[in-house]
């Protein structure tokens, strides 16, 4: 597979990230869980065979250190104006080329599923493409071809917002990519798919072996 994609992953400061997950793991600090979700997500993206570069947009020192050590390019969140501004900033930093914005809460993500979705985004109409989350209301992935602005609309009811903005939905069976984690129930569902090593350690579950790498 040809590595053509730059993937932008925005990550909030850990103290305010994933607020609905606070208390999901009573024996673990909330910040540790938020960091684990981000690190497992970024690690899976780095392992994706069609991804050439991963930009993590964050102002959190721990996120910057850990994802940078994993191999991501860390971009300070200069706008500091929310998720969509961070994605736009990362895309502008990346420059021309195939670009995607991805949420940082996909701890079960399989690199092969991300590769399949990104490859699907390069087929058909030359336009922005988005992938709804598991419930179908949010968005986990937004992709654009060279020369087309991402124009992100992440947030509540973002799937409908992206569709209304002219983006086309991606269709495929990619459960680990669509399983974002906002609540304790989401985390349990991600665990059934197989968590990445950092999140699995915190949850006290066995990390998947070869299954997650495909």
Swiss-Prot record:
Keywords: GTP-binding, Nucleotide-binding, Nucleotidyltransferase, Transferase
Pathway, per record: Cofactor biosynthesis; coenzyme F420 biosynthesis
Class of this enzyme: transferase
SUPFAM superfamilies per record: Nucleotide-diphospho-sugar transferases
GO molecular function: GTP binding; phospholactate guanylyltransferase activity
BP-aspect Gene Ontology terms: F420-0 metabolic process
Top-rank taxon: Bacteria
EC numbers for this chain: 2.7.7.105
Catalytic activity: phosphoenolpyruvate + GTP + H(+) = enolpyruvoyl-2-diphospho-5'-guanosine + diphosphate
Ligand binding (phosphoenolpyruvate): 139, 155, 158
Pfam hit, one: NTP_transf_3
Classification via PANTHER family: 2-PHOSPHO-L-LACTATE GUANYLYLTRANSFERASE
Family: Belongs to the CofC family.
Role description: Guanylyltransferase that catalyzes the activation of phosphoenolpyruvate (PEP) as enolpyruvoyl-2-diphospho-5'-guanosine, via the condensation of PEP with GTP. It is involved in the biosynthesis of coenzyme F420, a hydride carrier cofactor.
Protein name: Phosphoenolpyruvate guanylyltransferase
């Amino acid at each position: 597979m040809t590595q053509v994609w730059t993937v932008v992953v925005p990550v909030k400061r850990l103290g305010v990230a994933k607020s609905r997950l606070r208390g999901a793991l009573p024996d673990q600090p909330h910040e540790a869980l938020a960091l684990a979700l981000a690190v497992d997500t970024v690690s899976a993206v780095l392992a994706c065979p069609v991804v050439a570069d991963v930009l993590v947009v964050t102002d959190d020192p721990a996120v910057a250190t850990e994802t940078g050590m994993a191999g991501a390019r860390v971009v300070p969140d200069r706008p500091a104006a929310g998720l969509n501004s961070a994605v736009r900033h990362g895309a502008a930093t990346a420059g021309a080329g195939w670009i995607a914005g991805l949420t940082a809460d996909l701890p079960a993500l399989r690199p092969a599923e991300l590769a399949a979705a990104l490859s699907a985004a390069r087929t058909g109409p030359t336009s922005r493409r988005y992938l709804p989350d598991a419930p179908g209301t949010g968005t986990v992935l937004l992709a654009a071809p060279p020369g087309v602005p991402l124009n992100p609309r992440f947030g509540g009811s973002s799937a409908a917002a992206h569709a209304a903005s002219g983006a086309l939905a991606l269709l495929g069976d990619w459960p680990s990519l669509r399983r974002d984690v906002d609540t304790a129930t989401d985390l349990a569902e991600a665990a059934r798919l197989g968590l990445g090593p950092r999140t699995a350690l915190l949850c006290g579950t066995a990390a998947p072996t070869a299954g997650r790498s495909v």
